[in-house]
Regions:
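Donor nucleotide-sugar recognition loop
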Residues: 89-95
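Acidic catalytic patch
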Residues: 64-89
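Short, well-structured N-terminal submotif of metal-dependent ribonuclease cores
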Residues: 1-38, 51-63, 120, 130-131
Length: 131
């Protein structure tokens, strides 16, 4: 059985929209994973962006993810404690930092992102999913 796939906010949006920026290897991996997960923080991030006019979302946009079999996972105390594992990101976007920490808090998880700063960390469980 494939490992757990954890996707960041941008990847979740690309999946929901069928965006071609996701590379074929990522799509194949996500289709074969035992579980595909995104953070509830991603929902909050998207709501904030929609609220300030940076993004237009349908009223029930979270259903788009659930209908694709993506599980939405709460941010836990364990995830919060994992933030200290990434001191080089102290000035990076807080949502990205928290989502990375959440993905890294559970073993056997692969994190999919297009964020250059997160990919540049060189972690073996972080995958660059953009073309």
């Amino acid at each position: 059985m494939a490992r757990r796939a954890f996707i960041d906010t941008q990847v979740a949006l690309w999946l929901a929209k069928g965006d071609s920026r996701l590379n074929s290897g990522t799509l194949k991996w996500l289709n074969s994973s035992s579980e595909t997960v995104m953070s509830a923080l991603s929902i909050a991030e998207l709501e904030i962006k929609a609220g300030i006019g940076k993004l237009a979302l349908p009223k029930d946009f979270a259903e788009l993810f659930l209908n694709q079999g993506i599980k939405i996972e709460a941010f836990s105390q364990e995830s919060a404690a994992s933030l200290s594992r990434f001191p080089s990101l102290v000035r990076h976007d807080p949502f990205d930092r928290m989502i990375l920490a959440q993905a890294g808090a559970k073993q056997d998880t692969v994190f999919f992102t297009a964020d250059r700063a997160l990919v540049a960390l060189g972690l073996d469980w972080v995958v660059d999913c953009a073309h």
